[in-house]
Amino acid sequence: MDKANNGMNNWIEGIPYELAFWNNLYRWRWTYEGLLSWSNYGKELCLEGIDARSVLPSATAAAARSGKPIVLDVGAGMSYAPGNFYLNGTERQEIDIRYIDPLAFHYNRILKKRHKNLPEVTFGVAEYLSSCVADEADLVIIQNALDHSFAPIKGIIEALRTLHTGGFLYLNHHPNEAETEDYKGFHKFNICEEHGKLIIWNKESRRDVNELLNGFATIDVKTVENGHIVALIKKTAEVPASLYDDKASIRELCHSNHLLFYQVYSGHLSMKLKCSYAFYNFIQFFVQALPHNLKIKLKKLIKQA
């Protein structure tokens, strides 16, 4: 319980930076337009390192269940990275895509504040994802987000529980990002590929995901040309009950909510988060206004200092 609460508290302390980043990215016209030119919103679904069509059902199979393939973009932030349709042969197949993030309330406020006509983000937490959607998704996408969670292994198990048997979980992450970012903000875990295995680790723990999934899922892991770690996991059987405990999850949430309520209303955490947001928002106001190439150069100089 204490470990879960510590993970939650560390994650909460990373919220101000994340909100300041998106608030100012959406503030400036050129950064917002740059985001849309990079994302596949309104375009064909594109997944780096694989053919997206190979992990989605045929139009006939999708129609037999829900009419459209269900795709969950978990930890989506405000990136709108995946596309909205795919080509089934020559036929355009629409996707029921849901952008899911625990900070949905804040992101939707930013959308409204910046007058952006984009789909609202749906609330959902990777570590408790099956409480929102269970056994019906065709594809779960987690990009640059699993290593930002407070319990990434639990996030993988929960993602698999949302899939029907035969569904896919697609992961795409920068290698060892917590090490790169010095464990600041949401960066508490590293993801890497070692001899075809997916490893999730930090200074306190290390897990072999291939070993964890043995018997109920297959996994293909590779490092693509730009260095990203891409893993494609196919659910082949139901997740063993020994790997999750819904009652324990409820206890964790109740306990964490109680502590959070106390800390916020005691004033300490509330003031700390407000001060952190004010600081990061000030910094991001200027950082996001800079040309992209200059931002990259400054980041490299800071790391070398």
Predicted regions: what is each one?
Residues I153-F168:
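A short glycine-rich, Lys/Arg-flanked "PGG" loop and its adjoining helix->strand segment in the class I
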